[in-house]
């Protein structure tokens, strides 16, 4: 779901925002996993709270709180609308305490990490816009080098094997395709945006489920499945342009 939010921004034509969001989101998951492993703080026990969900990882910081405040606040920053989105992010953190799976300190820690990654993302985007950093469209070689470096970090510092063999291939595939896709586009109307999101999302669902039934349940084929998904996310704007759903920026 969190990756689809970034894909949706990308499909909308907010290329820089979507790519930066996904890269920072994936990096934030690595930091969350490593922080949990470092502190190894326990979650509430049945003697302290009514536990309504099953969790097996350490408690601090709350990943749900971190992701919630990061995702909704970033969307609010893009649209320059703060109140509702930030409120939703806060509610996710509060719900984790209500479900008995986190202490308030876990949630506060998650919020702090989420805000830190939000500020990192917005600062990076603004720096890219002002060309204070290497532009995303600078050279193909730089983009390819960054892609492989990013995939290396995900694979060796990521969390469980599922993260390494699914998220890393998806990100590598999507970013690698984008390294050679030198164009900008926009979806001019809300109606066309809905069509673009339905087309892109339906493709992800069909490919993910269809290839799962077609391929054997092994790590190499799971990796291949997510490589194909990453390529679809990056290439589907070409279909939008072909069908007139999107138009090239001049």
Predicted regions located by residue number:
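Short helix-capping/hinge motifs at transmembrane helix termini and TM-loop junctions
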Residues: 12-13, 39-40, 100
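Interfacial segments of alpha-helical transmembrane regions
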Residues: 8-28
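First transmembrane helix
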Residues: 1-9
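Membrane-embedded catalytic cores of phosphoryl/pyrophosphoryl-handling enzymes
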Residues: 4-5, 19, 29, 33, ...
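Generic signal for short, ordered secondary-structure residues
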Residues: 13-14, 87, 215
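C-terminal regulatory/interaction regions
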Residues: 185-250
